[in-house]
Amino acid sequence: MERYIGTYQTFQTVSRKEAANLIGADNLIGDRYSIECTIEDGVQKAWLVNRFDQRVGYFEPKYSRELSILKAQGMTLVAVLSFVAFTDHPEPGYYWGDVAVFAFDPAYQTTMETFITSVSKEIGKGRRPRVQLETRGIENIIESNGTWLPSETVPYPAKEKGTALVKTHRSITDRLVEESRKGNKGCYLLSWAFLLSVVAFAILGMKSCGLF
């Protein structure tokens, strides 16, 4: 069994319902996902499942098969949301995304949890650390008990006509949402106050422009 395998991988959404969940507050950049390996109509399909037990997207069959093999070998699978994108063709367009995928030997659970948490924080800031590592990089993780981070980063995809990256980092509101998830009531109230203030300013702006 390998000690560690990491990569960035794109995924698709089934419908606009899943896409709506993906761009909402239940799925923030840097969030962690479990991976559920299934066989549907004889085809391998690995699903991304968020902390609220919602399926938000799936990988293409070839990569899904690779993940199912790793899982059958006993490796732990974890994914971290890297970005969300929208492509307007073919009409009516569709949402898709990218995640950092980690597979590791459960014997290194604590070390890898620490490493993945650090990578998640960096991704939340809009920085994508390189996770596809050679032997030396893997040894750095283990020797540091997970505190080591690669200095190299992976760039976002080049701009393409008809495609836009709609989520690449955590906004101020996203960070407040995350604190409220942790039970910080003050941040929960502050996040609502912030959203209401944005709405209020928008209304005042429209009034000043004579729109109503």
Briefly describe each language-model feature range.
Residues 1-212:
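Conserved active-site motif detector
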